[in-house]
A protein has these predicted regions:
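Hydrophobic helical h-region of N-terminal Sec-dependent signal peptides
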Residues: 10-14
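C-terminal motif of bacterial Sec signal peptides marking the signal peptidase cleavage site
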Residues: 15-20
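A residue-level marker of the well-folded mature domains of exported/periplasmic proteins
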Residues: 25-382
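Acidic, polar-rich N-terminal leader regions of halophilic archaeal proteins
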Residues: 2, 21, 35-36
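Bacterial N-terminal signal peptides that target proteins for export
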Residues: 1-8
Length: 382
């Protein structure tokens, strides 16, 4: 995104629940909550819950949860509400990573007073589908990030659900383009699991590298890309070893679209003297090897939707955040580029935003030179 987004510093203890902080008792059956009455609410009436998908999914994950939480904190700060956990916002973790446990946790959050819940990631697809199917919690708003309520290939929406999608292919494109314009010729992509968002990041990365190679007049095969999925989003020393092997084999920079597993890739870069590209949020502070991060504006989208909810303008349905509304971007302010400039970034960003460049968002787990129309980049699937 072209404008620098300021992240709100987090404060307060991390142990309180809504109820422990003086939240009102749950309304009796049939009673109206602020979300039901119509008209704008007082900011203090907005009670937000961020729900984790598993016990391993922590708040300070330096990735997806953190980005959503930053948007929540921005809302609190802009409305003079206490920052951190407790008060008007809380983070909930399930005791296990099942749909039943997630639904139980959602119920717990609502019982504690939450009237708008943020659900980060594809792991909530089936749980929210079941909630809609059973007409549970119709007066509570749900913000599902990176997914839609889905089961067995069927999508089901409701008026109290916002399903937020990001143009990861555009963000990935910027990362691949910048890497090649910076002078790197050996690139790598390590995705976590081949879910649509990760696939779009990877396919965009390849297309960006191809576009840069064409812009620079490079020969066919001069830019090479190793491409793989790690099979999980959790860190593993084996991933650091694999990344180090890629670097020793001639790869200059690896784009790690892998959640927590990205930390292992960064460790491999540190060991082998390689470089990395972060994902989702600005991860530049995690390692000096990170030259930039392919961002989706989790904080912006979460803030906007909660703010609209407060103003009685909740946007239900499937929402798209892309270059046109600063929904994606590349971390430039913290970047460690030596050659690629802000002006170059802005020029290519504007071409994506105005439609001059259209990045293919087709989702097929393993890319190929044929389905991405590659003529210059040499792709190796691993």
């Amino acid at each position: 995104m072209r404008k620098c987004l300021k992240l709100i510093s987090l404060a307060a203890a991390f142990t309180l629940l809504f109820a422990a902080c003086g939240a009102a008792d749950p309304p009796a059956s049939g009673a109206q909550t602020p979300a039901q009455t119509g008209g704008a609410m007082q900011a203090s009436d907005v009670q937000i819950a961020l729900i984790a998908h598993s016990p391993e999914s922590i708040l300070d994950d330096q990735s997806f949860n953190q980005g959503a939480w930053d948007g929540i904190q921005r809302f609190l700060a802009n409305n003079g509400l206490p920052l951190g956990r407790g008060g008007n916002a809380e983070f909930f973790q399930p005791h296990e990573g099942s749909d039943a446990a997630r639904i139980d946790l959602i119920n717990d959050a609502i019982t504690a007073g939450a009237n708008i819940l943020v659900l980060p990631g594809f792991n909530f697809e089936e749980a929210l589908y079941e909630i809609i199917e059973d007409s549970l919690f119709p007066d509570v708003k749900f913000v599902l990030l990176d997914a839609s309520p889905r089961r067995d290939g069927n999508t089901r929406m409701a008026d109290n659900v916002a399903a937020v999608h990001y143009a990861e292919e555009q963000s990935g494109f910027l990362a691949g383009y910048a890497a090649v314009m910076e002078g790197h010729r050996g690139l790598g992509f390590m995705g976590g699991i081949a879910v649509p968002a990760v696939v779009r990041f990877g396919h965009g990365f390849i297309q960006g590298a191809e576009h840069a190679a064409a812009s620079l007049g490079l020969a066919a095969g001069e830019v090479t890309i190793n491409y793989t999925y790690l099979g999980q989003f959790n860190p593993d020393p084996a991933f650091a070893t694999q990344a180090a092997a890629w670097f020793h084999g001639g790869i200059d920079v690896i784009f790690a679209a892998a959640g927590g597993a990205g930390g292992s890739v960064f460790a491999g870069a540190e060991t082998a003297g390689g470089l990395a590209i972060g994902v989702d949020v600005d991860q530049g502070h995690l390692s000096e090897t990170i030259i930039t991060s392919a961002i989706k504006a989790l904080d912006v989208s979460v803030y906007d939707i909660i703010n609209d909810f407060m103003n009685d303008n909740f946007r239900s349905g499937e929402l798209r955040f892309d270059a046109r509304n600063d929904g994606i971007g590349l971390a430039m302010a913290s970047s460690r580029f030596q050659v690629f400039t802000q002006a170059q970034h802005d020029a290519i960003f504007d071409q994506i935003a105005n439609g001059t460049i259209v990045v293919d968002a087709t989702v097929s787990p393993m890319p190929s030179e044929a389905n991405l129309n590659l003529s210059l980049v040499s792709l190796t699937e691993i």
